[in-house]
């Protein structure tokens, strides 16, 4: 297969194309894309489309609408005591870290409750090994089991709770029930944009059909039935210092070693990659505007799409190098695309219309510039010199008769 596709829906496939052409402008709010056998099938659900819609009402519908991540302390608005229940693994952990720092900068009080034990090996990794930044900013850090949240926080009362941990009702219910009984005024929940059903009309927007049996959906329904003031946030992929789940690093690993970058399918699949500061600023906007946020679901993403090929090119530009992209059919080669590639092999793109309409929120993600910062840190920590094995890549490249490295 050719290194770069010869045709593109929105931009030239040539590596010399302006970087600005690699990003899809938010003005393209509604468009139809040619589907392929792999475009949306992985999000199909056995439940009917009618049963997939949540029974509670949403105010939103399909309508138009630098590395340092601090904000100036503001004297406007009520200062609140916020509890963040934070996961101890995965890409979402960094959301709680950024959110805590932004809240502290805005003058709020913050306690971050991390699942598990402070002495565990997980706490030696980012963002947990940077929690001193939260403490130095005036925040508190505690560890424990969210099912026993009252005991962990020692009876302290809070105005706002964010659950950035649970993926199912069994995990989240104890926190919701405790929050309600203890007088918490606002409950925020980190859900996932992965709960949307496949669509022939991307992007996903708030109000689109979801998979009714998905754990996050069940939690959202319980919140709607139980809590007076609640809001749910559905993120996608993210980048940012302190993230412990690979995103841009996957591309950098190959680019700095002059290896071809294998991307399944055409490489034109759209996705959304946000800087985590966008996610934290959206959450902070909800804390500042609780009535506007109440009872709503927000796609917690930036406002521009990028293609999979485009992400590879942007990462190469950030590293000051060229990139060879090779496309492949996972089934024909006999590899599992989920293991060989870090993103979904399909259009997976949501837009943050509700946050713009209801909260007056604006995205600050700028992938070309953000990726330059990320590459600087990548080199600073020495990952560009780390020994890395590429067994699946080698299998793919061998099948395509492509040299492993230039």
Curated annotation (Swiss-Prot):
Write out the similarity annotation: Belongs to the NAD(P)-dependent epimerase/dehydratase family.
Organelle transit peptide: 1-72
Q: What does this protein do?
A: Binds and cleaves RNA, particularly in stem-loops. Associates with pre-ribosomal particles in chloroplasts, and participates in chloroplast ribosomal RNA metabolism, probably during the final steps of 23S rRNA maturation. May enhance transcription by the plastid-encoded polymerase and translation in plastid via the stabilization of ribosome assembly intermediates. Required for chloroplast integrity. Involved in the regulation of the circadian system.
Q: Which UniProt keywords apply?
A: Chloroplast, Phosphoprotein, Plastid, RNA-binding, rRNA processing, rRNA-binding, Transit peptide
Instruction: Report, from the record, the phenotype seen after gene disruption.
Output: Lethal when associated with CSP41B disruption.
Q: What is this protein called?
A: Chloroplast stem-loop binding protein of 41 kDa a, chloroplastic
Annotated Gene Ontology cellular components are: apoplast; chloroplast; chloroplast envelope; chloroplast stroma; chloroplast thylakoid; cytosol; plastoglobule; ribosome
Where are residues bearing Phosphoserine located in the sequence?
266
Q: Where in the cell is it found?
A: Plastid, Chloroplast, Plastoglobule
Which GO molecular function terms does the record list?
Answer: mRNA binding; poly(U) RNA binding; rRNA binding
Task: State the InterPro entries in the record.
Answer: Epimerase_deHydtase (IPR001509), NAD(P)-bd_dom_sf (IPR036291)
Q: Gene encoding this chain?
A: CSP41A
One Pfam match:
Epimerase
> Can the keyword Disulfide bond be found in this entry's annotation?
no
Please report the organism this UniProt entry assigns to the protein. Arabidopsis thaliana
SUPFAM superfamilies registered for this protein in UniProt: NAD(P)-binding Rossmann-fold domains (SSF51735)
**How does the record describe its quaternary structure?**
Component of a complex made of CSP41A, CSP41B, ribosomes, and the plastid-encoded RNA polymerase. Interacts with CSP41B.
- What are its GO biological-process terms? chloroplast organization; circadian rhythm; plastid translation; positive regulation of DNA-templated transcription; positive regulation of translation; rRNA processing
């Amino acid at each position: 297969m050719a290194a770069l596709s010869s045709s593109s829906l929105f931009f030239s496939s040539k590596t010399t194309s302006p970087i600005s052409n690699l990003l899809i402008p938010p003005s393209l709010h509604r468009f139809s894309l040619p589907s392929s056998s792999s475009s949306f099938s992985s999000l199909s659900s056995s439940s009917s489309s009618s049963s997939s819609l949540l029974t509670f009402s949403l105010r939103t519908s399909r309508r138009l609408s630098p590395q340092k991540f601090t904000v100036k302390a503001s004297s406007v608005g009520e200062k609140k005591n916020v509890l963040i229940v934070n996961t101890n693994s995965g890409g979402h952990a960094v959301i709680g870290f950024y959110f805590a720092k932004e809240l502290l900068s805005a003058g709020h009080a913050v306690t971050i409750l991390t699942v598990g034990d402070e002495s565990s090996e997980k706490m030696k990794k980012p963002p947990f090994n940077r929690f001193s930044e939260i403490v130095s900013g005036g925040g508190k850090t505690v560890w424990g089991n969210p099912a026993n949240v009252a005991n962990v926080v020692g009876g302290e009362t809070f105005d706002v709770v964010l659950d950035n941990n649970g993926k199912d009702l069994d995990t989240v219910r104890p926190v919701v029930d405790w929050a309600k009984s203890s007088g918490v005024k606002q409950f925020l929940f980190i859900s996932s944009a992965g709960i949307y059903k496949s669509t022939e009309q991307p992007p996903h927007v708030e109000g689109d059909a979801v998979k009714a049996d998905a754990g996050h959906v069940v939690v959202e329904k319980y919140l709607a039935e139980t809590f007076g003031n609640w809001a749910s946030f559905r993120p996608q992929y993210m980048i940012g210092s302190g993230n412990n789940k690979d995103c841009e690093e996957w591309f950098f690993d190959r680019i700095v070693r002059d290896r071809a970058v294998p991307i399944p399918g055409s490489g034109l699949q759209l996705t959304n990659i946000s800087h985590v500061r966008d996610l934290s600023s959206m959450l902070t906007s909800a804390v500042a505007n609780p009535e506007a946020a109440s009872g709503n679901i927000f796609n917690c993403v930036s406002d521009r799409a990028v293609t999979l090929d485009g992400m590879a090119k942007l990462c190469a530009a950030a590293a000051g190098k060229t990139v060879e992209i090779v496309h492949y059919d996972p089934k024909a080669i006999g590899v599992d695309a989920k293991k060989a590639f870090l993103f979904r092999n399909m259009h997976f793109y949501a837009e943050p219309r509700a946050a713009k309409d209801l909260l007056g929120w604006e995205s600050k993600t700028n992938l070309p510039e953000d990726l330059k910062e990320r590459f600087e840190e990548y080199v600073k920590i020495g990952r560009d010199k780390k020994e890395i094995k590429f067994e699946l890549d080698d299998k793919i490249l061998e099948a395509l008769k492509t040299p492993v490295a230039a």
